[in-house]
Amino acid sequence: MCDPNRLLTLALATLLAGCAGPATRPDAHVSVAEPALPTAPAPAVAPPAAVIGAELARLQRLAPDADPGVLALALEARACALSSGEVDPDARLAVIDYSRPSTDKRLWVFDLAHDRLLHREYVAHGSGSGENIARRFSNVDGSHATSLGLFRTAETYVGGNGYSLRLDGLDPGFNDHARSRAIVMHGAWYVNPDLIRSQGRLGRSQGCPALRQEVAKVVIDELKQRQLLFAYADDAQFLRGGRSFACSGRSAARIVADARDAASGGGLARTAIAAP
């Protein structure tokens, strides 16, 4: 007959061995909350248009300077992620509009559950994407370019760029290599308004959405662990092929153009994207 105490000791040893393991990168110190094991998402169901419209009105009130078309597409992607179980209903939403120059504060962080704008901030793009305005985007390692689409935030760690936030891309072909590329949110000395005055733009990252060092920890702590980040640009390939916002069956160009048109009171929408 087996000794019960010996069996208990073996079971505990097995359990502890399963919990041990190195961080994803050698210099990483992972936060206590580890990312959940991936599960097959349920099929996304198109969100009711009235729900998106009401949420868009709230975001426009909180961020009147943001492009309503960008906010609408971000909300569409958020609704699709909610319907497929990718995130919880109270997940915060960060929106980056890379169609704006780096000299603009083009990052907004929303807490929709409490109807608040938490931050509007500067954010750098990758050196492979352009100078002051990002014009090229990539999902390829070594490109040093920014990726577009919907990201779900994950764990924090401390590495070469200090306190950082890992991102998992939810747009296949556009940002789903973010983790393997080490595309993370972090603070950086080159995200500094003084550089705008001296060189006409912010410094650039190797593809990461880098923030001012003074605010990076606060923003990261508010976005860590299964919140959402939507990165937008007027990029035709992304707007045609992105999947994160496609569950309603409406094209991205139509979503963006309709929101801009509604915000302008029915007048001509901004023509950066031609609706089909």
Which residues make up each language-model segment?
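Exported/periplasmic cell-wall-interacting domains
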Residues: 2, 134-276
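N-terminal post-signal-peptidase region of extra-cytosolic proteins
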Residues: 73-98, 103-106, 133-139
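Bacterial N-terminal signal peptides that target proteins for export
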Residues: 1-8
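N-terminal Sec signal peptide cleavage junction
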Residues: 19-22
